[in-house]
Swiss-Prot record:
Location(s) in or outside the cell: Cytoplasm
GO cellular component: cytoplasm
Protein name, per record: Imidazoleglycerol-phosphate dehydratase
Catalytic activity: D-erythro-1-(imidazol-4-yl)glycerol 3-phosphate = 3-(imidazol-4-yl)-2-oxopropyl phosphate + H2O
One matching Pfam family: IGPD
Pathway: Amino-acid biosynthesis; L-histidine biosynthesis; L-histidine from 5-phospho-alpha-D-ribose 1-diphosphate: step 6/9
Segments crossing the lipid bilayer: none
InterPro entries linked: IGPD_sf, ImidazoleglycerolP_deHydtase, ImidazoleglycerP_deHydtase_CS, Ribosomal_Su5_D2-typ_SF
Species in which this protein is naturally found: Staphylococcus epidermidis (strain ATCC 12228 / FDA PCI 1200)
Recorded name of the encoding gene: hisB
Keyword set, alphabetical order: Amino-acid biosynthesis, Cytoplasm, Histidine biosynthesis, Lyase
PROSITE patterns cross-referenced by the UniProt entry: IGP_DEHYDRATASE_1 (PS00954), IGP_DEHYDRATASE_2 (PS00955)
EC number of this enzyme: 4.2.1.19
Molecular-function annotations in GO: imidazoleglycerol-phosphate dehydratase activity
Family designation: Belongs to the imidazoleglycerol-phosphate dehydratase family.
Amino acid sequence: MNYQIKRNTEETQLNISLANNGTQSHINTGVGFLDHMLTLFTFHSGLTLSIEATGDTYVDDHHITEDIGIVIGQLLLELVKTQQSFTRYGCSYVPMDETLARTVVDISGRPYFSFNSKLSAQKVGTFDTELVEEFFRALVINARLTVHIDLLRGGNTHHEIEAIFKSFARALKISLAQNEDGRIPSSKGVIE
């Protein structure tokens, strides 16, 4: 199933669709580094994204990065609501040379976000690295997930951020995998 949201504000214009089918993604945010990270996210999560985005990047990349996180989170929430069953929990460690990142995901219906990741530099190219946390916070809260992201070892900032995106993607893929018994993985019988 394909989920789509068009979101237009005074700051950004977004047309984003998401599918859980692992086909080729098309990502055009106008922010090269973010495009790169989202491409890695789709590859390692098995999700397909189509993103056409424009915005006030002449100011900086904050609005477009955060708004894309918001919409991807909303799309993930729709995916989870319609999925017959899922594993719920996922954890992934991802090394990238000297860097090691860990992400733990719970599709809980209770939004909580912990980002214990001191990045080594304030910029990668022109991209403000503080936006990594803003992107994931927006995604997690809007998807109603519990997520803990920890950068355990670092060095090169590009490697740090890449390991974070990949570890999140792989943990999410595990948590979205179909549950073997076909039931909702909650003693309540429901995740809201």
